[in-house]
Curated annotation (Swiss-Prot):
Region described as Disordered: spans on this chain: 1-35, 149-169, 237-305, 421-462, 477-575, 637-726
Species, as recorded: Homo sapiens (Human)
Protein name: Bromodomain-containing protein 3
Activity regulation, free text: Inhibited by JQ1, a thieno-triazolo-1,4-diazepine derivative, which specifically inhibits members of the BET family (BRD2, BRD3 and BRD4). The first bromo domain is inhibited by GSK778 (iBET-BD1), which specifically inhibits the first bromo domain of members of the BET family (BRD2, BRD3 and BRD4). The second bromo domain is inhibited by ABBV-744, which specifically inhibits the second bromo domain of members of the BET family (BRD2, BRD3 and BRD4).
A GO term for molecular function: histone H3K9cr reader activity
InterPro entries: Bromo_Brdt_I, Bromo_Brdt_II, Bromo_chromatin_reader, Bromodomain, Bromodomain-like_sf, Bromodomain_CS, NET_dom, NET_sf
Gene assigned in the entry: BRD3
Pfam name, any one: Bromodomain
């Protein structure tokens, strides 16, 4: 009996209906395809890379359910897919756009995850392949452009089939994939991601040939799944309850968002639907859909670009950065609206009344629906707030949201404070202030809803720092706008000193010196105020941003953030890192707290470390962190160099007029004696004609540092001394 039972399954192919369905079509004359730059990239880069991978062999051909003795495979997997089919479709120009091809890849991986157990070797192999797939897709050209000639070329090339071996086919079946429907089940995926590194490959590869028949061989992955596969329907129901964990199963990227997924095609049975959600979250990182969205909207955006205000243009650049591949590892869950139905998050819309995502923000930005920067910031913060509200604080998607919000807040805080045009001056202040209010409101919501007190405290401190930065910017603006006035005068005075030797110009020089001293007397009060304002600015936690904004404002505000963006991404050389280390050691103790804050806010791995005992390894820090530190340290050291001047100025201002006059008299008397001695030897007649003019060289030399009151004393002193020397 037992033997008969064994034989029965082997004969299954011939008996009931478990015959392999026809493989997916690879060409369709009625459905015209085309060749685009993105499809060419998929064929020449993505498929070629994956095909050569050591884990690719199970996916070379459609799953042969009869050979592998998987009677229920086609009951569970409604849309089989494999890499060999995708390759042939690309060669035959079957696809109209790259998104269709990517959908087939997603289907293939999804089928594997649906049919097999999360711990099976084949699942780990699929995850490793999917990771590479997503990395390659992220580098695909952003705009899809049709290429004219290559259409006929594809049909002649079908050597791909020859490359596959019988053993390969068998295993392929096990991992074969179903149509593009992502799923939410498979919570264990999270733990799987690390496992990807494990290489069951050699074992499987070695036994490939034996895989089909004996379940005991290394290929048990396929065989094992078979058993669980039959009873999976009940487990599926159980998994449904774990609605939020669906996101936690992102095979390739360590990102999970219960709430972010593209709506998948309708599903026929609950099991498939469930897996779909999971797969979707795994597929979310794929950038192409995002690019498609951008491509479709670019023309409209480009046409209206000029109408965006200075601030909204900056906001648009922030949005573009958040959508860039630089942040894709943790931003992908927020690319599209949450598909609660596909992810089986039945209570999502009961809890979240105002869903928000980056594609919606982009659509509103392109449609000019934001009146100002604060409207844009409110939507972005609403998106993060929703995430904190719905997911538990220790959920991975919350950690991803925090990372992305750090990027957003840091860039938003650097918004140019004031546009170049004078009329627009008041505008920047308003958005910045309202931004603070907005962030405080969103932080309050998220704290009450999600209960993640740590993130709220961080946000509150960041808010306080941003407000202090704002004050510092305004104060330094006022201070620095006055400071440059003195520079041209010093240059003039130097020139005058060189000309003092000429008798004819002496009289003119004397008048100029007096005129300048009078001007200085007028400029002195604002200069004092500027110095006083500098003091509170130093107390502010962060002056780095302020200093940078002021410098850039002097050039072109409109282009400032572009150059800054490029600069931030530049990696540091060894010499630059060494110099930065030396500069940090030169900072006073009170400035080091800000250095630690910059590092902790930008480096998640150091966020929980003790600020008093933090160790900085410059090799492990990101280029953006190093550049931010460099800017901050430079601004601190520049201020340090300026301090002696302002300090001496304050001391002089504090002295009484009488003391100043007396000191100047003494200095002038000494210098005038020397000067008069030198002049008497070379230019006696001139001194006789104008006794008061000769000594003017002395006072003029000091005029740059003396206050206006010393002008009169110097002139009177010079006349009396010159008469004595005669």
């Amino acid at each position: 009996m037992s033997t008969a039972t064994t034989v029965a399954p082997a004969g299954i192919p011939a008996t009931p209906g478990p015959v392999n369905p026809p493989p997916p079509e690879v060409s369709n004359p009625s459905k015209p395809g085309r060749k685009t730059n993105q499809l060419q990239y998929m064929q020449n880069v993505v498929v070629k890379t994956l095909w050569k991978h050591q884990f690719a062999w199970p996916f070379y051909q459609p799953v042969d359910a009869i050979k592998l003795n998987l009677p229920d495979y086609h009951k569970i997997i409604k849309n089989p897919m494999d890499m060999g089919t995708i390759k042939k479709r690309l060669e035959n120009n079957y696809y109209w756009s790259a998104s269709e091809c990517m959908q087939d890849f997603n289907t293939m991986f999804t089928n594997c995850y649906i049919y097999n157990k999360p711990t099976d070797d084949i699942v780990l192999m699929a995850q490793a392949l999917e990771k590479i797939f997503l990395q390659k897709v992220a580098q695909m050209p952003q705009e899809e452009v049709e290429l004219l000639p290559p259409a006929p070329k594809g049909k002649g090339r079908k050597p791909a089939a020859g490359a596959q071996s019988a053993g390969t086919q068998q295993v392929a079946a096990v991992s074969s994939v179903s149509p593009a429907t992502p799923f939410q089940s498979v919570p264990p995926t999270v733990s799987q991601t690390p496992v990807i590194a494990a290489t069951p490959v050699p074992t499987i590869t070695a036994n490939v040939t034996s895989v089909p028949v004996p379940p005991a061989a290394a290929p048990p992955p396929p065989a094992t799944p078979i058993v669980p596969v039959v009873p999976p329907t009940p487990p599926v129901v159980k998994k449904k309850g774990v609605k939020r964990k669906a996101d936690t199963t992102t095979p390739t990227t360590s990102a999970i968002t219960a709430s972010r997924s593209e709506s998948p095609p309708p599903l026929s049975d609950p099991k498939q639907a469930k897996v779909v959600a999971r797969r979707e979250s795994g597929g979310r990182p794929i950038k192409p859909p995002k690019k498609d969205l951008e491509d479709g909207e670019v023309p409209q955006h480009a046409g209206k670009k000029g109408k965006l205000s200075e601030h909204l243009r900056y906001c648009d650049s922030i949005l573009r950065e958040m959508l860039s591949k630089k942040h894709a590892a943790y931003a992908w869950p927020f690319y599209k609206p949450v598909d609660a139905e596909a992810l089986e998050l039945h209570d999502y819309h009961d809890i979240i009344k105002h869903p928000m995502d980056l594609s919606t923000v982009k659509r509103k930005m392109d449609g000019r629906e934001y009146p100002d920067a604060q409207g844009f910031a409110a939507d972005v913060r609403l998106m993060f707030s929703n995430c904190y509200k719905y997911n538990p604080p220790d959920h991975e998607v919350v950690a991803m949201a925090r990372k992305l919000q750090d990027v957003f807040e840091m860039r938003f805080a650097k918004m140019p404070d004031e546009p170049v045009e004078a009329p627009a001056l008041p505008a920047p202040a308003a958005p910045m202030v309202s931004k603070g209010a907005e962030s405080s409101r969103s932080s309050e919501e998220s704290s009450s809803d999600s209960g993640s007190s740590d993130s709220e405290e961080e946000r509150a401190t960041r808010l306080a720092e941003l407000q202090e930065q704002l004050k510092a910017v305004h104060e330094q603006l006022a201070a620095l706008s006055q400071a440059p006035v003195n520079k041209p005068k010093k240059k003039k005075e130097k020139k005058e000193k060189e000309k003092k030797k000429k008798d004819k110009e002496k009289e003119k020089e004397k008048h100029k010196v007096k005129a300048e001293e009078e001007k200085k007397a007028k400029v002195a009060p604002p200069a004092k105020q500027a110095q006083q304002k500098k003091a509170p600015a130093k107390k502010a936690n962060s002056t780095t941003t302020a200093g940078r904004q002021l410098k850039k404002g002097g050039k072109q505000a409109s282009a400032s953030y572009d150059s800054e963006e490029e600069e931030e991404g530049l990696p540091m050389s060894y010499d630059e890192k060494r110099q930065l280390s030396l500069d940090i050691n030169r900072l006073p103790g009170e400035k080091l707290g800000r250095v630690v804050h910059i590092i902790q806010s930008r480096e998640p791995s150091l966020r929980d470390s003790n600020p008093d005992e933090i160790e900085i390894d410059f090799e492990t820090l990101k280029p953006t962190t190093l550049r931010e530190l460099e800017r901050y340290v430079k601004s601190c050291l520049q201020k340090k160099q300026r301090k002696p001047f302002s300090a001496s100025g304050k001391k002089q201002a504090a002295k009484s007029k009488e003391e100043l006059a007396q000191e100047k008299k003494k200095e002038l008397e000494k210098r005038l004696q020397d000067v008069s001695g030198q002049l008497s030897s070379s230019k006696k007649p001139a001194r006789k004609e104008k006794p008061g003019s000769a000594p003017s060289g002395g006072p003029s030399r000091l005029s740059s540092s003396s206050s206006s009151e010393s002008g009169s004393s110097s002139s009177s002193g010079s006349s009396s001394d010159s008469s004595d020397s005669e």
